[in-house]
Curated annotation (Swiss-Prot):
<feature type="binding site">
    <location>
        <position position="536"/>
    </location>
    <ligand>
        <name>Cu cation</name>
    </ligand>
</feature>
<feature type="binding site">
    <location>
        <position position="313"/>
    </location>
    <ligand>
        <name>Cu cation</name>
    </ligand>
</feature>
<feature type="repeat" description="Kelch 2">
    <location>
        <begin position="279"/>
        <end position="321"/>
    </location>
</feature>
<dbReference type="GO" id="GO:0046872">
    <property type="term" value="F:metal ion binding"/>
</dbReference>
<protein>
    <recommendedName>
        <fullName>Galactose oxidase</fullName>
        <ecNumber>1.1.3.9</ecNumber>
    </recommendedName>
</protein>
<feature type="signal peptide">
    <location>
        <begin position="1"/>
        <end position="24"/>
    </location>
</feature>
<keyword id="KW-0732">Signal</keyword>
<feature type="domain" description="F5/8 type C">
    <location>
        <begin position="42"/>
        <end position="189"/>
    </location>
</feature>
<feature type="propeptide">
    <location>
        <begin position="25"/>
        <end position="41"/>
    </location>
</feature>
<dbReference type="InterPro" id="IPR013783">
    <property type="entry name" value="Ig-like_fold"/>
</dbReference>
<dbReference type="InterPro" id="IPR000421">
    <property type="entry name" value="FA58C"/>
</dbReference>
<feature type="repeat" description="Kelch 4">
    <location>
        <begin position="436"/>
        <end position="490"/>
    </location>
</feature>
<keyword id="KW-0883">Thioether bond</keyword>
<feature type="binding site">
    <location>
        <position position="622"/>
    </location>
    <ligand>
        <name>Cu cation</name>
    </ligand>
</feature>
<keyword id="KW-1015">Disulfide bond</keyword>
<keyword id="KW-0964">Secreted</keyword>
<feature type="binding site">
    <location>
        <position position="537"/>
    </location>
    <ligand>
        <name>Cu cation</name>
    </ligand>
</feature>
Length: 680
């Protein structure tokens, strides 16, 4: 497999060129804070570049003629470079420290690599620190890896007052000992508001070499696997057969990269499901008939069988028998009615279901079938059935035996009337035992359409019966479309990002304030806002440590709305009343790591617990995460800190695959999850 660097060189002819702001007369230009060389391929922080007039900069090493101040002289043709010579080159990490002389509300940093055609010193892994005194730096506000090319790099992060900024180059992109920077800028927000206690916290930022338009949690490692398309910043004009991926390891903070060619599949805009064996099944998209399989245990991509129908923007869902159902997807592969089909992990084949008609689930989108069969809200349920909760007003039951079938489940309505279509809204099964699904947001049309605050609770019964549907609370605080969400261990649903009016590849009308829905109280609660726009092509996933991974947006090539990063949201249940991280309960032992549906598991913990839940490992793209669902567990205390519980006996509730087991104490603080595989 090719490394990103070689792929960047292959695509150099189509990469965007940095824009140069003309210098004033006099040659070297002004060192003031206006961004000198703004890339068209990444989103800058919201705010303005800080004047560099009075800055003092220091670096750990410098070559004569390439001193520290060359990175703030306003001239893209000069650069700071660490020492090199016959006596040996100092190895990274290398540090570049800025004293701005006054305290600023800092929310980002930009770094322009050297522009002379030489790659020496390009920064790979890096960390960004802030300090008020130049001595106490704390933990990084941003870290990760930048894509290896010459365009401007950004680190966007939550606003903090600071006087000092430090960029640490942990590695060089090509494994060399040097670091070089042509220009560096620091950004300021217009104001700063300290996070309110009790509403969770954002940060740190994880810088990525790609725009993560799709992602999954690797169940055997806990790493976040992400991918974009054949390019790190765009999907259009794909030659096919190539996907750029990245992985972030929460335990080390390291971002790694891989270019996948073995499956000959550009996996942009796919359907994604974790099958009953735990493999991640990625279907269609830019290569509209292809299937790729990711095996977490071997960290390998495997070619899968072609689908019967070419698809893009379809959804898929794992069923009670571990097979995967998919339907729709007219974004690519032709515009026509794309009925259902099923993938069998055992036979590695796709089978058409000609009577599982797509027509009943179409929205009335003004762009027609090209959009109206996109992103279905699908839930594998009992007896091999699949429930379609939206985004169309119409709900349906799909059946997957023989030639398939479909039966109306009525409309998504309440005492407030029939809900409109909610394309690019969200649907989350927060209590699979009771069949509870929360739906919220979206808009009548895919794009150029105002979002809604509508929210509903759908309660499923037996397949084929009409579900009960009621309005949830008073709806969302904020109208949203292109937002994302995850179910949390305590049964609440975290909702973030989105736009008030859906316009793909624009960061207009963003919603920065997330919400949490608490079902016991039937109430939505505002949380602390973030400062990075997350709209079209953003993703969210629940991490095994109970935090939320939220990233991406854009993937539009030569635009200013590409978000090469992610953030971590820490829910309030991980803090104590003093605002410090709470002491977590720990699972010290599980009687098994694999259990059949209906089986019992005994666990030991280091302290008393009161609740437990299973949450299926998630996959996410284009507002869809059909894999996540939560099972609240009934605990039996065996004495001391030993507990047991039974997994539901219906595989339509406890879908086969990998699950996260969380336990919670009386304060509601969750443990780090243990991974449990549920089998049939």
């Amino acid at each position: 497999m090719k490394h990103f660097l070689s792929l960047a060189l292959c695509f150099s002819s189509i990469n965007a060129v940095a824009v140069t702001v003309p210098h004033k007369s006099g040659g070297t230009g002004s060192p003031e804070g206006s961004l000198q060389f703004l890339s068209l391929r990444a989103s800058a922080p919201i705010g303005s570049a800080i004047s560099r007039n009075n800055w003092a900069v220091t670096c750990d090493s410098a070559q004569s003629g390439n001193e520290c101040n060359k990175a703030i002289d306003g001239n893209k043709d000069t650069f700071w470079h660490t020492f090199y010579g016959a006596n040996g080159d100092p190895k990274p990490p290398h540090t570049y420290t800025i004293d701005m002389k006054t305290t600023q509300n800092v929310n980002g940093l930009s770094m322009l690599p050297r522009q002379d055609g030489n790659q020496n010193g390009w920064i790979g892994r890096h960390e960004v620190y802030l300090s008020s005194d130049g001595t106490n730096w704390g933990s990084p506000v941003a870290s990760g890896s930048w894509f290896a090319d010459s365009t401007t790099k950004y680190s966007n992060f939550e606003t903090r007052p600071a006087r000092y900024v430090r960029l640490v180059a942990v590695t060089e992109a090509n494994g060399q000992p040097w670091t070089s920077i042509a220009e560096i800028n620091v950004f300021q927000a217009s104001s700063y508001t300290a996070p309110q206690p009790g509403l969770g916290r954002w940060g740190p930022t994880i810088d990525l070499p790609i725009v993560p338009a799709a992602a999954a949690i690797e169940p055997t490692s806990g790493r976040v696997l992400m991918w974009s398309s054949y390019r790190n910043d765009a999907f259009g004009g794909s030659p096919g057969g190539i996907t750029l991926t990245s992985s972030w390891d929460p335990s080390t903070g390291i971002v790694s990269d891989r270019t996948v060619t073995v499956t000959k599949h550009d996996m942009f805009c796919p359907g994604i499901s974790m099958d009953g064996n735990g493999q991640i099944v990625v279907t269609g998209g830019n290569d509209a008939k292809k299937t790729s399989l990711y095996d977490s245990s071997s960290d390998s991509w495997i070619p899968g069988p072609d689908m019967q129908v070419a698809r893009g923007y379809q959804s898929s869902a794992t069923m009670s028998d571990g097979r995967v159902f998919t339907i729709g997807g007219s974004w690519s592969g032709g515009v026509f009615e794309k009925n259902g089909e099923v993938y069998s992990p055992s036979s590695k084949t796709w089978t058409s279901l000609p009577n599982a008609k797509v027509n009943p689930m179409l929205t009335a989108d003004k762009q027609g079938l090209y959009r109206s069969d996109n992103h279905a809200w699908l839930f594998g349920w009992k007896k091999g059935s699949v429930f379609q909760a939206g985004p169309s007003t119409a709900m349906n039951w799909y059946y997957t035996s023989g030639s398939g079938d479909v039966k109306s489940a009525g409309k998504r309505q309440s005492n407030r009337g029939v809900a409109p279509d909610a394309m690019c809204g969200n649907a989350v099964m927060y209590d699979a035992v009771k069949g509870k699904i929360l739906t919220f947001g979206g808009s009548p049309d895919y794009q150029d359409s105002d979002a809604t605050t509508n929210a509903h609770i759908i309660t499923l019964g037996e397949p084929g019966t009409s579900p009960n549907t009621v309005f949830a609370s008073n709806g969302l605080y904020f109208a949203r479309t292109f937002h994302t969400s995850v179910v949390l261990p305590d049964g609440s649903t975290f909702i973030t990002g989105g736009q008030r009016r859906g316009i793909p590849f624009e960061d207009s009308t963003p919603v920065f304030t997330p919400e949490i829905y608490v079902p016991e109280q039937d109430t939505f609660y505002k949380q602390n806002p973030n400062s990075i726009v997350r709209v079209y092509h953003s993703i969210s996933l629940l991490l095994p440590d109970g935090r939320v991974f939220n990233g991406g947006g854009g993937l539009c090539g030569d635009c200013t709305t590409n978000h090469f990063d992610a953030q971590i949201f820490t829910p309030n249940y991980l803090y104590n009343s003093n605002g410090n991280l709470a002491t977590r309960p720990k699972i010290t032992r599980t009687s098994t790591q694999s259990v059949k549906v209906g089986g019992r598991i005994t666990i030991s913990t280091d302290s008393s617990i009161t609740k437990a839940s299973l949450i299926r490992y998630g996959t996410a793209t284009h507002t869809v995460n059909t894999d996540q669902r939560r099972i609240p567990l009934t605990l039996t205390n065996n004495g001391g800190n030993s507990y047991s519980f039974q997994v539901p006996s219906d595989s339509g509730v406890a879908l086969p695959g990998y699950w996260m087991l969380f336990v919670m104490n009386s304060a509601g603080v969750p443990s780090v999850a243990s991974t449990i595989r549920v089998t049939q």
